[in-house]
Amino acid sequence: MDLSSLRPAKGAVKGRKRVGRGPGSGNGTTAGKGNKGQQSRSGYTRPVTEGGQMPMYRRLPKFGFTPPNKKSVACVNLAQIQMWIEKGLVGEEISVLDLKHLCNASNQDYFKILGNGEFESAVTITAHFFSKSAVEKIEKAGGKTVTAYRTLEEASKVNGLPFEEALLTPKAPVLKKKKKSDKS
């Protein structure tokens, strides 16, 4: 007995089912898929079938909630701003546009300045939010804080105002509509 004489047991290996090869094969014409319908078309597979086993999407619990009006806030520490100033990446005034480019943020982001780190530069920083410690450190160094009210995307959509001005003007309050009372 040698390796070349080894064969699988009789009946252990089944031949491949060749479908769609004429009526004599028993699986011609419709190739065992029945007549018409989505299941007979090519490319059809049932999504997430696990063959009678409880599928994953039903085994796992539902959880969480995504608020529709969630604000995306990018946080920047004063130590980071100080580093940018020392490297010469920003000047005397740091705008929301500067923060966007230096943080690789999107146009929908709000920016919050946090007070971590040392800060000795007298600069004007424009951002949407400031922590109390950040305001104290900036003013102690001789700088100013300017609050922006809109994201870059919102400011670009304001008609009749220059971009920089649109950033800094507060949004108009949303007025609630009064319900009309039915007179009958």
UniProtKB/Swiss-Prot annotation:
GO terms, molecular function: rRNA binding; structural constituent of ribosome
Q: Which cellular component, as a GO term, is one annotated location?
A: cytosolic large ribosomal subunit
Entry keyword Ribosomal protein: yes
- Is the keyword Ribosomal protein assigned to this protein? yes
- Quick one: where's region Disordered? 1-62
A Pfam family: Ribosomal_L27A
Residue span of the signal peptide, if any?
none
Against InterPro entries, the record matches this protein to: Ribosomal_uL15, Ribosomal_uL15/eL18, Ribosomal_uL15/eL18_sf, Ribosomal_uL15_bac-type
Q: Where is the composition biased (Gly residues)?
A: 21-35
Task: Write the record's keywords in alphabetical order, separated by commas.
Answer: Ribonucleoprotein, Ribosomal protein, RNA-binding, rRNA-binding
The record's section on SUPFAM superfamilies has: Ribosomal proteins L15p and L18e (SSF52080)
- A GO BP annotation: translation
Quaternary context: Part of the 50S ribosomal subunit.
In UniProt terms, what function does this protein have? Binds to the 23S rRNA.
Family the entry assigns:
Belongs to the universal ribosomal protein uL15 family.
Q: Which protein is depicted?
A: Large ribosomal subunit protein uL15
Q: Which organism is it from?
A: Chlorobaculum parvum (strain DSM 263 / NCIMB 8327)
